[in-house]
Amino acid sequence: YIDETYLKNVLDAPLIEAAKHNIAVAAIILVEPAAKCIDPDLGILLQHPNYLRGVYTMPNMTNLESVNCYAAAFDFLAKRYCTTNNRYGRIAHWIMHNEVDGSVDWTNMGIKPVTVFADTYIKSMRICYNIVRQYDEHAEVFASLTHSWTQIANVGWWLYTSKEIIDLLNV
C-alpha cells in the first residue's frame, strides 16, 4: 500500500542526512481533503464529514474506522521514524496541523463552536502523542497557531483566536 520508492527518496533520504548531522527534524502533519487524496477511499475515511472547503481538513474523529485508520498512519510513521537506530532518519517534533486558529483553510471541519473544534484537535494531538511516545519517549508533539492571539486575524478564513484554543488545550 505504501510506495517504498517514494518513502526512500522523499522522506528517508533527507531524514537520514539530518540524523547524520544531529539535526532535529520537525514534521507538520496535514490531512488532505478526499478530492486531493491519491486514494479517494482513504481520503473519504480521513476527511472530516463536515469539511466544506480549504487546503486541508481536520481528521475525522467521528467514527471508529476513521480513528483507527488515522492511528494506523501514525503507528506506521512512528515505527519508521522514532527508532533508536535512526535507520530511516528521525522525526523528533510532530507539529499537529497548521495554524489551527485559521481552521477554515487549514483544518476545516465546517463551522463549529470553538469547544467542539478544540475537542477534535485535542483528540488528534493525543492520538499522535500516545503513539509516537510508544516508540520514542523524547518525541514532542506541538500545536500550530498563528500570532493572532486575541483577535481573529482574517475574518472569513479564521474562526477562532489562538488564545481561545490555547485556553481549551490547557483545561
Where are these regions (language model features)?
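N-terminal substrate-binding region of glycoside hydrolase catalytic domains
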Residues: Y1-C82, N86, A92-I95, D101-P113, ...
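Noncatalytic carbohydrate-binding groove/subsite architecture in carbohydrate-active enzymes
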Residues: R90, F117-V171
